[in-house]
Amino acid sequence: MKDSEKAKLIERIRSAAGLDDDDRATLIGMINERRSYGMVWEMQPEDAEERLRRHQPVLIEEPELAIKSDAPDAPRHIIIEGENLESLSALTFTHAGKIDIIYIDPPYNTGNKDFRYNDDYVDPDNDYRHSKWLSFMKRRLGLAKRLLSDDGVIFISISDIEYANLKVMCDSQELFGEGSYVTTLHVEMSATQGMKVRAAQNGTIVKNAEYILIYAKGGRKQIARNLLYDYRPDYDDHYSIYLRDGQRKSVREMFRAAYPDVRWRKMTDLYYQSPEFRRFVAENVDYIFADDKITGFDDITLTKGEIREVERDGKTYYIYHNGKRLRQLLPLKSSFGPCDDFDRSHGLRKIRGDWWKDFYKDMGNVSKEGDVVFENGKKPVRLIYQLLKMASRRDSTVLDFFAGSGTTLHALMQLNADDGGRRQCILCTNDENGICRDITYTRARNAIKGKGGPRGSLAANSLLFFRTELTDRRHSPAAMRSLAALATDMLRVRENTFDEQREFCGLRTNPLLIRCFGDGTRLTAVIYREEIIPKIAAAIAAHRPDCPITLYVFSPSENPWREQFGSVAGHVRLIAVPAVICNCYERVLPARNETNDNQA
């Protein structure tokens, strides 16, 4: 049976009357049964998806919640309030292929009222507990994949409860594929202390780590744009050569001469034990080297003892001849500098791998971060800060669609402040118990105003607040015109043009006819009445703005009245609304066919 035929049959089983959940699970399991590596579970129906098959979301701004920075080049961040399947669907229209980094911290499905499905908490003894969680995640990750740029990366925090299931599901070709898997980070989020000590003494292997699954959409494994470093308390005694002013001596000899009263035996322990040795290394790091083999430099000719500095492939090598062959000197300074540990140490360091240690130390202060209360749900700012520092560019767009307390935005704004970046962040969260406004938004506002952060105000940031609103997919001509107006805020988000202009090419704007948004570098106009197109075309021809112009033009078809724009059509980007919106949602989540539903 072909996959398409199988999918249709499964859909009929799901909607058939007279079957209970066990019957459906058995039938679907029989259809899916095959000898292959992968995962089979019953895809559980979800109310949010069913709503989206009959309705389509738009984004509506709440302008009274906007925070505008005085800084002219301040990045604009976005908070979207709404069920995150609705928010993600809207983002497939505004940001498909535009998101560089996704970080999410989804519910771990502990059974302790952390995961709701169809408005009900999923209990630990629910037979479909894992199926519901996987169904929930697959729908959202499928949309997330559409949002990632070609070299985009997603980080997914998870515990051991669903790690194995999530890994197999993400490895499937329906989502990211095994070739896109980068690695799994092991994050030390707790220590064996307190109540865990008794459990450990009784023989229990206590849990200290959580996991972060990493996938790169394009399959690129080298996702670290910036290296992270952990402090190294011991000294590598291979770094035993002291080279200065052409004179080669030993580190032992030079340290003894500088600090004759210090008594020691093993150099490997000396860095940890002796503040004098740490001071000596810091002051002389430019002159300390290790001897190592080297290949690929047969074109270099040196006399015995001669040292030459060679630049190759963007890297500096210190080559010398020991009388038999070429060797290299490895500088200690490449392993010395500021570290990314909890203490923000400076000294000997090693490049961090997949073991991210000591984040349990941050947990003692995490409740104070952002100056909001969010029980058992916050991740440390330092954790997400370092993920972004490692993997993002300074102009990256970052998404978190399980925003919770808003740590991702807080971390991103801090990183921008530290490295001069202009990253933009989009947060999505629901409005359950007022979380979006009372916690997520409040924390962002606090951070911008300098409350609940380690290093003061983050005022050079602007913030816009949107909510999702559902509109019927079945459109009468009047409803289509209404949708074009209702979707205006979503078009602003799509084009990243937010400041409303009172004029467009010398014409006064009118909310019933045309609205215009832009910042001087580009303009977006939304035309609601086709009668004014000749006047708009004439204004464009007369003014010939030197910035890019996008015109969203109401049209009952997919033709944005191109012929009426005449000669200026080639100077602007013309898009018909609402067709461009409806077509996008139909590709992402086809509308429910009421006739077929009734027949099934």
Regions found by a protein language model. Give the residues of each.
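DnaQ-like (DEDDh/DEDDy) 3′-5′ exonuclease domain used for proofreading
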Residues: M1-Y103, G111-H130, R139, G305, ...
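Conserved Class I SAM-dependent methyltransferase catalytic core
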Residues: H130-H186, Y441-I448
